[in-house]
Amino acid sequence: MSEEMNDQMQVRRQKLQELYDLGIDPFGQKFDRTSMATPLHEDWDQFSKEELHEKEEESHVSIAGRLMTKRGKGKAGFAHVQDLSGQIQIYVRKDQVGEDQFAIWNSADLGDIVGVEGVMFKTNTGELSVKAQSFTLLTKALRPLPDKFHGLQDIEQRYRQRYLDLITNQDSTQTFIKRSKILQEMRNYLNQQGFLEVETPMMHQIAGGAAARPFVTHHNALDATLYMRIAIELHLKRLIVGGLEKVYEIGRVFRNEGVSTRHNPEFTMIELYEAYADYHDIMDITENMIRHISEKVLGTAKVTYGEETIDLESKWKRIHMADAVKEETGVDFFNIQSDEDAKIAAKEHGIEITDNMKYGHILNEFFEQKVEETLIQPTFVYGHPIEISPLAKKNAEDPRFTDRFELFIVGREHGNAFTELNDPIDQRARFEAQLVEKEQGNDEAHEMDEDFIEALEYGMPPTGGLGIGIDRLVMLLTDSASIRDVLLFPYMRQK
C-alpha cells in the first residue's frame, strides 16, 4: 500500500474519532428509505425546473447510498449518491440542513454511506437532484475507493475484491442482476411445465454422472471417503425410478480440473429429467426454455455476443455428429467400420489421437478439433458415439451411436442431453467398459455404481435428461468473455 493511501486512511481515522467525540455513531442505525435513484429519474425527469418547484410539497423523498462524487465549498455542495438502481445528485446547503449536519457533510468522504431527506428539483444545468433537508452519516468508510475516473483497472483485483468492482462498475452489477433473473426465469419456465424442483446430496460415495476428476474429502465420524459431486444426474434418475416423473435441480457441482476463461472448479448446473420423453423432446424443452429466458430477461431473442449476433428466435439447427464432421472435413464416419480405419483417417487429417482410442473416441476428436468452434448459431449435435456416452441409450438404428445431443452456441458447448439408458444389464456392461478404460489410464472414466444399477433393476421408465452449465449460459446472455465475469467470487490462486 502506498504512503498516499496510508495518509488517506489516517485522515479518515481522525475523522472517525472526531465523530465519536461529537457523540455521533459513525456506523449508524436503521434509515427509512422511501425512494431509489433510477425510479426517481423515471418519475421526475419529465418535469421542468419550474414544474418541480410547483410540485415541491409532493416530491418529498428519502434516499440512501454511497457517496461517489462530491464538490463545492463554502455554504453549499453537490454530490452523487449511488444505490443498487443507479445514481442521483444531491444538493446540500448549510441553511437547509443546519450547522451540525452541514459539518458532517463537510467531513464526509467518497465511499461514505449516507441518508438524505429532501425534495426534488433541477439545477440550472437541468440535472435532477434532491435538495437536502436532512443529511445523515450512516457508515464511515475507512478506506478510499479506487480512483473514480479509472475505476478498477486491475482485472485480477476486480475478481478478488468483487465488492469494489460492484461499487465502481455498474456494468458488473447489471451482469449479476441479470444472472439472478436468468435463474428466476428458468425456474418459472420449468415450474409452468410441471417440473418439480428437488435437492440431492453434494457429497457422494462414488463420483458418478460425468467424465471428470473429483474433489475428495473424508467424513471423520463415519471414517469414509466422500467425493464432491461432479454431476447431479444419478440421484435424479433414482427419483425418476421412484415416480417423480418430471424433476430438476439447480445446484453447485465440483470438478478438480483446470481453471480457464470457461472453467471454474465449482460451477452451477441445472439438470432435469422427464419420464416418457426422449432426446427429441428434450431438444424442444431446451430451445424453448433458453428462448423464454432471453425474451424475459433481455426483452429479445436476438443476442449480441462479441462481434456475433446470435439468433435464438429462429428454429435451431439439428445435425448428426457424423454429418457435421463430413460437412467440415469430407470424412464419412458412417462408412468407417473399424478402429484402424478411423485411425488412418485421423492421421490423414492431422487429428491428434492416442493409441487406446477407439472408433467413437476418434469421431469425437474429429468433431472437437475441426467442427466445434465453427458452430456459432444454436446447433443441436446428436448421435454421439457409445464410447463417450456411458449413460445414454443406444440408437436403435445404429448401435455405434447413442440418442444423445449437445447444444453448441458461439463454438461452445451449452448443454448435454440424452435419452437415458434404462437397461440395467446394458448399464452394467457400460460401467465395466469404463473400468477397463480406467485401467488403461483414463482417470476420468466412470466408476462402477452398484446402487444405481440396483435402482435401475426396479424399472426406470423411458426418460429424457438434460444438463446445462448456468455460468456459460449467463456468459452468453450478458456478453461476458470470461466465466469469472459471471461468478461473484471466482476461484483465484492464493497471493
UniProtKB/Swiss-Prot annotation:
* InterPro entries hit by this protein: Aa-tRNA-synt_II, aa-tRNA-synth_II, aa-tRNA-synth_II/BPL/LPL, Lys-tRNA-ligase_II, Lys-tRNA-ligase_II_bac/euk, Lys-tRNA-ligase_II_N, Lys-tRNA-synth_II_C, NA-bd_OB-fold
In its UniProt record, which GO terms are filed under biological process?
lysyl-tRNA aminoacylation
Free-text cofactor note: Binds 3 Mg(2+) ions per subunit.
Q: Which SUPFAM superfamilies match?
A: Class II aaRS and biotin synthetases (SSF55681), Nucleic acid-binding proteins (SSF50249)
Q: Where are the transmembrane segments?
A: none
GO molecular function terms noted in the UniProt entry: ATP binding; catalytic activity, acting on a protein; lysine-tRNA ligase activity; magnesium ion binding; transferase activity; tRNA binding
Question: Is Aminoacyl-tRNA synthetase among the key words of this record?
Answer: yes
The top EC class is ligase
What does UniProt give as GO cellular component?
A: cytosol
Reported EC number(s) for this entry are 6.1.1.6
Compartments, record wording: Cytoplasm
Q: Which cofactor does it need?
A: Mg(2+)
Residues annotated as binding Mg(2+) 1: 406, 413
Q: Where does Mg(2+) 2 bind?
A: 413
Q: Which reaction does it catalyse?
A: tRNA(Lys) + L-lysine + ATP = L-lysyl-tRNA(Lys) + AMP + diphosphate
Instruction: For this UniProt record, give its keywords in alphabetical order, as a comma-separated list.
Output: Aminoacyl-tRNA synthetase, ATP-binding, Cytoplasm, Ligase, Magnesium, Metal-binding, Nucleotide-binding, Protein biosynthesis
Quaternary state and interactors? Homodimer.
Q: Per the similarity annotation, which family is this? A: Belongs to the class-II aminoacyl-tRNA synthetase family.
**Could you identify this protein by its name?**
Lysine--tRNA ligase
Q: What is the lineage of its organism?
A: Bacteria, Bacillati, Bacillota, Bacilli, Bacillales
